[in-house]
From Swiss-Prot:
The lineage of its organism: Eukaryota, Metazoa, Chordata, Craniata, Vertebrata. GO terms for biological process: negative regulation of canonical Wnt signaling pathway; negative regulation of cell growth; negative regulation of cell migration; negative regulation of cell population proliferation; positive regulation of apoptotic process. This is Transmembrane protein 196. GO terms for cellular component: cytoplasm; membrane. Acts as a tumor suppressor in lung cancer. Inhibits tumor cell growth by inhibiting cell proliferation and migration and promoting cell apoptosis. Inhibits metastasis of lung cancer by suppressing beta-catenin expression in the Wnt/beta-catenin signaling pathway. The gene is Tmem196. The chain crosses the membrane at residues 11-31, 41-61, 67-87, 100-120. It is found in: Cytoplasm; Membrane. It comes from Mus musculus (Mouse). Keywords: Cytoplasm, Membrane, Transmembrane, Transmembrane helix, Tumor suppressor. It is a multi-pass membrane protein.
């Protein structure tokens, strides 16, 4: 079983990877766009749903709040969908004889790596949320147990002061 620190470390590494993929995708997209303008061919495929996913991943690893985890999961799903669409669009237009073939191949490779990263990040976010839920439940249970012990201790302290006691509505009251 992974600890919270290991999950957070893995999320940070994957988030940095996603940011790197996003920046690389933007660079490949910019080069591809400029070459497409020269050749008067349409440029398909977006660069970077992964950049946003990586930034949200770092925020999620730092904050660990429920809303940030939901935001990160949503970004991972959007990155996953964007990566799949990007791959499908590029696969449809890629011709091995095209001068843009190496750039399309690079974009498709980045999309595949990004899709894998988004999938693993989503899974790790679910693991982190589950771990945090168990931790909060354990803390709440410990707090309730501690407050119950303190109430029992207070009751026994009141009973042991030597004066006759009465129980009224769950409270110990002295008769004198």
């Amino acid at each position: 079983m992974c600890t919270s620190g290991q999950i957070i470390g893995s999320l940070l590494v994957l988030s940095v990877l996603e940011i790197g993929l996003g920046v690389s995708s933007v660079a490949v997209g910019a080069v591809s766009f400029s070459l497409a303008l020269r050749e008067h061919t349409p440029q398909l495929g977006d660069s970077s749903p992964f950049l946003l996913c990586g930034i949200c991943g770092i925020l999620c690893a730092k904050k660990k709040s429920g809303l940030v985890m939901i935001l990160f999961s949503a970004c991972c799903i959007c990155g996953l969908i964007g990566g799949i669409l990007n791959f499908q669009f590029l696969r449809a237009v890629t011709k091995k004889t095209s001068s843009l073939y190496p750039l399309h191949l690079a974009s498709m490779s980045l999309a595949c790596i990004g899709i894998g990263g988004c999938t693993v990040s989503s899974w790790l976010t679910c693991r982190l949320a589950s771990y945090e839920q168990r931790r909060m439940f354990s803390e709440r249970e410990h707090s309730l147990h501690h407050s119950h012990e303190m109430a029992e201790k207070e009751m026994t302290d009141n009973m042991s002061n030597g004066a006759p006691q009465l129980m009224f509505n769950g409270r110990v009251q002295s008769m004198f």
